[in-house]
């Protein structure tokens, strides 16, 4: 699958998420990021926002549940081979087709957008001592690892080619692009995030 333009996507995603930082006034209906994390409820709301983003049709609301991933796995019976539909093109693994490529770009962008939201929560935990924060940190680390894992399996070589370049593993909210890590490095970071998350969530029970 053709590599996604990482630098451009990262800039667009992070600019969108950080837009409120460039405003000196509060806009009705928009919550300033600094104010969002002033209290425990703000963290809960932000966490719920991450889960809502994961439920989007570009992620687990469709494409990564029963949509694109099932189509490229050819789990659907293709009874319309004579018709040029997006489904048949995806079924045939025509990744560069003008109808298929937007699906791929949307998955990539939405996944990193959601990772950025999770990282925003994680970056703002420091300096607060709300009782719920260990559980929130554990959940957001899990989300970050989970999304990177799905991006890795879709857009990178398998672990047998562990030294090859894979995807960026993004660990902080930033508008700066992140260089790609190797397949092995991404797996190591996934395991590290999940290991910490397991301890936090176990102790939060």
Residue ranges and their predicted role:
Residues 67-74, 136, 142-143, 170:
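Acidic helix-start/capping segments at beta-turn-to-alpha-helix junctions
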Residues 154-192:
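Short coil/linker segments at helix-helix boundaries
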Residues 1-20:
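Sec-dependent bacterial lipoprotein signal peptides
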Residues 55-60, 75-76, 147-158:
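Secretory-pathway/luminal and periplasmic proteins that interact with or process carbohydrate-rich
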Residues 20-67:
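Membrane-proximal, proline-rich intrinsically disordered regions
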Residues 44-47, 51, 112-115, 119-122, ...:
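Extracytoplasmic/secreted envelope proteins and their assembly/folding machinery
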Residues 84-154, 176, 181-182, 198-204:
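Conserved, well-structured interaction surfaces
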Residues 64-81, 85-86:
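An acidic, Gly/Ser/Thr/Pro-rich helix-cap/linker signature
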């Amino acid at each position: 699958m053709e590599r996604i333009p990482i630098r451009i996507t990262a800039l667009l995603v992070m600019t969108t998420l950080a837009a409120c930082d460039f405003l000196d006034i509060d806009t009705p209906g928009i919550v300033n990021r600094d104010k969002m994390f002033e209290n425990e409820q703000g963290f809960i709301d932000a966490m719920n926002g991450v889960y809502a983003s994961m439920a989007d049709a570009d992620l687990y609301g469709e494409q990564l549940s029963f949509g694109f991933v099932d189509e490229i796995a050819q789990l659907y019976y293709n009874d319309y081979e004579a018709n040029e539909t997006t489904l048949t093109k995806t079924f045939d693994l025509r990744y560069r087709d003008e109808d298929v490529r937007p699906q791929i770009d949307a998955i990539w962008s939405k996944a990193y957008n959601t990772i950025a939201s999770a990282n925003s929560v994680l970056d703002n935990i420091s300096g607060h001592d709300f009782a719920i924060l260990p559980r929130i940190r554990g959940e957001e680390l899990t989300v970050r690892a989970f999304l990177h894992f799905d991006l890795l399996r879709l857009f990178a070589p398998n672990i047998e080619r562990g030294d090859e370049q894979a995807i960026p593993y993004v660990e902080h909210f930033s508008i700066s692009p992140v260089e790609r890590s190797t397949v092995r490095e991404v797996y190591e970071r996934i395991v590290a995030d999940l290991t910490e998350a397991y301890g936090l969530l176990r102790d939060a029970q």
